[in-house]
């Protein structure tokens, strides 16, 4: 049977093997009854014939399915080809700007004649255009040279500012400050305003030197500098030393 037959042929081809298989089985039964002397040989021949019939039916069935599958696939290729044929070309600017009637714009012949006559007479045509007002120019970006010129000016202004003393100012030879040991309590009748005090490094250094000097004086004489200034001992009398227990309890002599 050929594989190119239609649906009717495939149905007939499937029905024919079934009838043949029935005939084969009936023939096998008849052979089994008649051939009593060689049952093994007849049974082997019957099995071979049965297997051959089954292989033929399987081949025909698979061929029919392939034929049925080819029919819808051929029909499905047609819409795919139609889809691939769909294409579009965008319109040009002139086609988009066409008027409603579809004809391109063209000046009337009388206007064309008038313009040619003006060109022949005057040589040039006056441009008919609306002159729009001008806007102010855009300020130009500042160049790097101008910026570099402005930076020294800013530095000069900073240098011209008066220097304010701070606690970190240091002089090689600090000026000895005034005596700051005087009690600065406000006396009755004086102004309540107090002078603003600023911390300066030279003052800190001078205070350190003064305290060191006081310590050396106390260690050398055993008396405080204030007591020496307040008392006026006579030069003949020896200096009175205070007991070491009052000033230096740890420096007693035994």
UniProtKB/Swiss-Prot annotation:
Pfam families on file: PAXIP1_C
A GO CC term attached to the entry: MLL3/4 complex
Residue list for modification Phosphoserine: 143, 148, 237
Tissue: Ubiquitously expressed.
Coiled-coil spans in chain: none
GO biological process: DNA recombination; DNA repair; positive regulation of cell cycle G1/S phase transition; positive regulation of intracellular estrogen receptor signaling pathway; positive regulation of transcription by RNA polymerase II
Record-linked InterPro entries: PA1
Region (Sufficient for interaction with ESR1): 161-254
Subcellular location: Nucleus
UniProt keywords, alphabetically: DNA damage, DNA recombination, DNA repair, Nucleus, Phosphoprotein, Transcription, Transcription regulation
Keyword Nucleus among UniProt keywords: yes
PANTHER family found in the cross-reference section: PAXIP1-ASSOCIATED GLUTAMATE-RICH PROTEIN 1
Subunit comment: Component of the KMT2 family MLL2/MLL3 complex (also named ASCOM complex), at least composed of the HMTs KMT2D and/or KMT2C, the common subunits ASH2L, RBBP5, WDR5 and DPY30, and the complex type-specific subunits PAXIP1/PTIP, PAGR1, NCOA6 and KDM6A; PAXIP1 is required for the association with the MLL2/MLL3 complex. Forms a constitutive complex with PAXIP1/PTIP independently of the MLL2/MLL3 complex. Interacts with NCOA1, ESR1, NR3C1, AR.
Designated name of the protein: PAXIP1-associated glutamate-rich protein 1
Source organism of this protein record: Homo sapiens
Organism phylogeny: Eukaryota, Metazoa, Chordata, Craniata, Vertebrata
Gene: PAGR1
């Amino acid at each position: 049977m050929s594989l190119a037959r239609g649906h009717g042929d495939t149905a007939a081809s499937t029905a024919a093997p079934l009838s043949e298989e029935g005939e084969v089985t009936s023939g096998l039964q008849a052979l089994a009854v008649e051939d009593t002397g060689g049952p093994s040989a007849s049974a082997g021949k019957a099995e071979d014939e049965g297997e051959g019939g089954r292989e033929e039916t399987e081949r025909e069935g698979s061929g029919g399915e392939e034929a049925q599958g080819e029919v819808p696939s051929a029909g499905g290729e047609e819409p795919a080809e139609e889809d691939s044929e769909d294409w579009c070309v965008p319109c040009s600017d002139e086609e988009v700007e066409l008027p409603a009637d579809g004809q391109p714009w063209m000046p009337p012949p009388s206007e064309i004649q008038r313009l040619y006559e003006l060109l022949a007479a005057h040589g040039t045509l006056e441009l008919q255009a609306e002159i729009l007002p001008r806007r102010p120019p855009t300020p130009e970006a500042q160049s790097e040279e101008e910026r570099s010129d402005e930076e020294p000016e800013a530095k000069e202004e900073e240098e011209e500012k008066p220097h304010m003393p701070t606690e970190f100012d240091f002089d090689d030879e600090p000026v000895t400050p005034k005596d700051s040991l005087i009690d600065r309590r406000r006396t009755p009748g004086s102004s309540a305003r107090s002078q603003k005090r600023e911390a300066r490094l030279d003052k800190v250094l001078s205070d350190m030197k003064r305290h060191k000097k006081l310590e050396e004086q106390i260690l050398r004489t055993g008396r405080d500098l204030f007591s020496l200034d307040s008392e006026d001992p006579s030069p003949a009398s020896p200096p009175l030393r205070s007991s070491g227990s009052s000033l230096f309890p740890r420096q007693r002599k035994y």
